[in-house]
Amino acid sequence: MMYVSLVHWLALAVALAVPFVTALGNVPYPQDDPFYYPSENGWQNEAPGTILRERKIQAASLGIFEWKLDAWQVLYRTAGARPDKPSYTVTTFLVPSHAHRDRVVTISSPENSNFIQCAPSYAFRKTGVLEIANFEPRWEQMLYTLFLAEGWIVNAPDHEGPESAFSAGRFGGHMVLDSMRAANNFKPLQLSSNPMHIGHGYSGGSTPNGWAASLHESYANELNVVGWSLGGSMTDPLYTLNSLDGKPTSSLVVAGAIGLMDAYRDEVGNLLDDEVWTEEGKIAEKVMRNSCVYESVIRYFGATFQSERYIKGGRNLSSWPQMRKISNMNTMGHNPRFTPRKPIFMFHALYDEEINWHQANKTAVEWCNNGANVRFLTYSSTSLVHVTTYLLNLPYIVQYMRDRFNGKDWYGGACQFDVESQNPALDVNVLGERFRGILEAALDMLGKEIGPNDSILKNRLKAGQNPNTHHKTKLHVLKKGDISPGEGGDHTKESKKAAAKFKAEKKHGKHH
């Protein structure tokens, strides 16, 4: 049975019912805006994170609802798929009232497209007209006030860069890390001399965020990163694209293939046009390059792309050696050299209908085998799917970030794998409280001052208190020290069974 998340169904319904609108003159699209491109030659010689352009903006949601905070956008020098390949992109800084100048949360919003018009930075602009197109980053931006309410400065990079290279993780990882450098370099933010950074990304945002975590040590180890949060994680590009084919969001198969090839075009040339696509496939590529994710999903809802209609010979994308090579290079955990060295919180629904749980779990296990510090939380309820898992984990994410900024221990530097079988949505009180907080967040964007003294989660997210008070994993019984995959810390049947299985295998020498 195929599932489509409720939020996605609603988004599709809105997209079909409301005509797409365009910016009316005062805010040009990125492809028409000189700000998105370096003004002079020589930018390639600047250090990564160097500011090339800057501007103050009026931030807004859906193009019309103003955010009452300070907001800037900067164009900065970064790197492409390889660290020695100069590139550039834009990031957006959001500064709440009474901001903590030593705490920055970098959020990689899902873009999931091959069209620069879908960039998160454009979605932040007040255009003066209702903007329904490019809904993917816009719905997540409504959740940013959960972080702004804490007094944290938010940094939101266009991690797909000028190529709009969706699914190219290393590419996005460089851009995320360099956005942190840009934040440190941007004087109007008035950051402390060594500010703390946390990276966060869910779904399509997990890819650049996870790779930023992986590349931090080798590419930008001067950054004071204190933690990473990622969920619904797309850690293996081809695995994800294969699993999506024929499903409601199958247009991502084409978008992902395009993104991977664009990031490495100097190595693979025009592989897709020359060897892969049929005429129908070329039409699909053109659609992807001129539409945002929900438009392409509507156009190709449920299509099977790895078929003779779209691909020559009906071959699987993984049958091309170039595709396999690039996908392996962009698979988290594949190379032990790129193992994150800062605390990580990962969470994933076992029955995620969009991004398969197994790839994320495999990455967590491989990272742990190479010395990472990870908590991997699995939700085993069949009623939790891709988007709802994110929404219901927001309090966990906020608490995790608080703990990281406050320097609290994270499982003794080891790994912890837990299973949560209870669905918080089954408890009406939890559902009501959580979504009340989210609705308050939305209301705060419609006119209230955004900062640590506003109404968001004021009663529910009190300092030092875990906000998940119903059916939560029992944090006080989580073990410390060296904990291997499968050894859970809660009292659910799944966790006990996994721990017993692991101990039995360890006794017989299957684990070392």
From Swiss-Prot:
<dbReference type="Pfam" id="PF03583">
    <property type="entry name" value="LIP"/>
</dbReference>
<dbReference type="InterPro" id="IPR005152">
    <property type="entry name" value="Lipase_secreted"/>
</dbReference>
<feature type="glycosylation site" description="N-linked (GlcNAc...) asparagine">
    <location>
        <position position="316"/>
    </location>
</feature>
<keyword id="KW-0325">Glycoprotein</keyword>
<feature type="signal peptide">
    <location>
        <begin position="1"/>
        <end position="17"/>
    </location>
</feature>
<dbReference type="GO" id="GO:0004806">
    <property type="term" value="F:triacylglycerol lipase activity"/>
</dbReference>
<feature type="region of interest" description="Disordered">
    <location>
        <begin position="480"/>
        <end position="512"/>
    </location>
</feature>
<dbReference type="GO" id="GO:0005576">
    <property type="term" value="C:extracellular region"/>
</dbReference>
<feature type="active site" description="Nucleophile">
    <location>
        <position position="203"/>
    </location>
</feature>
<protein>
    <recommendedName>
        <fullName>Secreted triacylglycerol lipase LIP5</fullName>
        <ecNumber>3.1.1.-</ecNumber>
        <ecNumber>3.1.1.3</ecNumber>
    </recommendedName>
</protein>
<keyword id="KW-0732">Signal</keyword>
<feature type="disulfide bond">
    <location>
        <begin position="118"/>
        <end position="292"/>
    </location>
</feature>
<keyword id="KW-0442">Lipid degradation</keyword>
<feature type="compositionally biased region" description="Basic residues">
    <location>
        <begin position="498"/>
        <end position="512"/>
    </location>
</feature>
<dbReference type="InterPro" id="IPR029058">
    <property type="entry name" value="AB_hydrolase_fold"/>
</dbReference>
<keyword id="KW-1015">Disulfide bond</keyword>
<keyword id="KW-0443">Lipid metabolism</keyword>
<keyword id="KW-0378">Hydrolase</keyword>
<dbReference type="GO" id="GO:0016042">
    <property type="term" value="P:lipid catabolic process"/>
</dbReference>
<feature type="compositionally biased region" description="Basic and acidic residues">
    <location>
        <begin position="488"/>
        <end position="497"/>
    </location>
</feature>
<feature type="active site">
    <location>
        <position position="352"/>
    </location>
</feature>
<feature type="glycosylation site" description="N-linked (GlcNAc...) asparagine">
    <location>
        <position position="361"/>
    </location>
</feature>
<feature type="active site">
    <location>
        <position position="386"/>
    </location>
</feature>
<keyword id="KW-0964">Secreted</keyword>
<keyword id="KW-0843">Virulence</keyword>
<feature type="glycosylation site" description="N-linked (GlcNAc...) asparagine">
    <location>
        <position position="453"/>
    </location>
</feature>
<comment type="function">
    <text>Secreted lipase that hydrolyzes acylglycerol lipids such as triacylglycerols and consequently releases free fatty acid. Can hydrolyze 4-nitrophenyl palmitate to release 4-nitrophenol and palmitoic acid. Due to an absence of fatty acid synthase genes in Malassezia species, secretory lipases are essential for the yeast to generate free fatty acids from degradation of sebum and assimilate them as lipid sources for growth. Plays an essential role at the pathogen-host interface during disease progression.</text>
</comment>
<comment type="similarity">
    <text>Belongs to the AB hydrolase superfamily. Lipase family. Class Lip subfamily.</text>
</comment>
